């Protein structure tokens, strides 16, 4: 019975080529900024007969730290209001440091703007839920985010903007 347990790292990858396999590693995750405001408290904490309106904004930024390390920031803003009263406003910038290697260059933007925030989101979602709960409100459980759709929309907007001629 043969075993491959002793095969060296970076050995043949099955197609006859040797070299490093593509890898995406999370080196660190951190809260860069967290803000919770409840300007109307304690009056804003009273029960309501209907749910408040909640506006949510999401943004992703990525910056290189070195040739193979990147800092990706997921920004989540949630503002709850009832009539004209702001119940709470929570903002989180949640970051991750990623080591990315072995991928073709054309895959880097999708990795940075889709895969990396997808890995960060569950942790950021939990922080938002805990912040709203600790603020005296029911936990705000954000729905899953389609980062691929966000990325495609951003590419389309950038292409449309580049077609506009500056005079």
Curated annotation (Swiss-Prot):
Biological process terms in GO annotation: protein folding; protein tetramerization; protein transport
InterPro entries named in the record: SecB (IPR003708), SecB-like_sf (IPR035958)
The keyword Chaperone is annotated on this UniProt entry: yes
UniProt xrefs under NCBIfam families: PRK05751.1-3, secB
UniProt function note: One of the proteins required for the normal export of preproteins out of the cell cytoplasm. It is a molecular chaperone that binds to a subset of precursor proteins, maintaining them in a translocation-competent state. It also specifically binds to its receptor SecA.
Subunit and partners: Homotetramer, a dimer of dimers. One homotetramer interacts with 1 SecA dimer.
Listed name of the protein: Protein-export protein SecB
Gene (UniProt): secB
């Amino acid at each position: 019975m043969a075993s491959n347990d002793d095969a060296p790292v970076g050995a043949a990858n099955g197609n006859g080529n040797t070299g490093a396999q593509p890898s995406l590693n999370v080196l660190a995750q951190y809260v860069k900024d967290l803000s919770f405001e409840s300007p109307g408290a304690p009056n804003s904490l009273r029960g309501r007969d209907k749910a408040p309106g909640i506006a949510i904004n999401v943004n992703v930024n990525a910056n290189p730290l070195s040739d193979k390390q990147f800092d990706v920031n997921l920004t989540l803003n949630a503002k709850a209001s009832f009539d004209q009263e702001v119940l709470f406003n929570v903002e989180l910038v949640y970051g991750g440091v990623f080591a990315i290697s072995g991928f073709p260059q054309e895959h880097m933007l999708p990795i940075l703007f889709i895969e990396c925030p997808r890995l960060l989101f569950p942790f950021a979602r939990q922080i938002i839920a805990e912040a709203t709960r600790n603020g005296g409100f029911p936990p705000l459980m954000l729905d899953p985010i389609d980062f691929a759709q966000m990325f495609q929309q951003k590419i389309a907007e950038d292409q449309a903007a580049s077609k506009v001629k500056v005079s």
